[in-house]
């Protein structure tokens, strides 16, 4: 177990909404179990939330991925209901809204943490982006990605992202 668990974008739109996949739905229970284990061990759990505004389609990302998703305040923007009790429990948990693939606040949020575990959605977009940002900000720290608690846009892209993370000295379980 690492100092901090980062749960990336486990939101309704990525699970069962406009960008949902069967693979994303399949990992929800495993992510919940992992987050509970961290919380029960007194470890911090940080959740990212992909956040777009109503004008999403006119943004750079919206022009390249023209599927409205994770629009602030919508049901699709919400973190999965199965994870809500952990989000709301406080106890070292917080939610970080991010308007792009990666969060640039890890140094502020991590404090003196020296190890991280990352899981969530989508392996080939936001999970890998955050893993590489953490790697750049904390070059000597241990970083683990649990592949059984991640899903990509496709199974092939999931595997490709895992291979890239391994090449960047991120442990993939």
Regions found by a protein language model. Name each.
Residues 1-95, 140, 144, 153, ...:
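Active-site acidic carboxylates
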Residues 11, 51-52, 99-100, 122-125, ...:
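Short, flexible active-site-adjacent loop segments at beta-strand->alpha-helix junctions, enriched
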Residues 73-123:
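Internal catalytic-core helix/loop-beta-alpha segment
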Residues 103, 150-154:
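Short, small-residue-enriched loops and turns at beta-alpha junctions
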Residues 115-126, 144-150:
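Glycine-rich anion-binding loop/nest that anchors nucleotide
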Residues 127-137:
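Short Gly/Thr/Asp-enriched flexible loops that form oxyanion-binding sites at enzyme active sites
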């Amino acid at each position: 177990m690492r100092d901090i668990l980062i749960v990336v974008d486990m939101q309704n739109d990525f699970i069962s909404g406009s960008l949902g996949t069967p693979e994303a739905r399949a990992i929800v229970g495993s992510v919940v179990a992992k987050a509970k284990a961290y919380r029960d061990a007194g470890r911090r759990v940080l959740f990212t939330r992909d956040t777009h505004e109503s004008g999403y389609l006119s943004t750079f990302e919206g022009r390249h991925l023209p599927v409205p998703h994770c629009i602030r305040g919508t049901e699709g923007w919400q973190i999965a209901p199965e994870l809500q009790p952990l989000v709301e429990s406080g106890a070292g948990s917080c939610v970080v809204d991010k308007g792009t693939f990666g969060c640039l606040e890890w140094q502020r949020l991590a404090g003196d943490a020296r190890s991280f575990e990352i899981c969530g959605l989508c392996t080939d977009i936001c999970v890998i982006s955050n893993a590489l940002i953490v790697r750049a900000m904390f070059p000597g720290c241990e970083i683990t990605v649990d592949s059984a608690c991640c899903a990509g846009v496709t199974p092939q892209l999931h595997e490709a992202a895992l291979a890239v993370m391994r090449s960047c000295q991120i442990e993939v379980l």
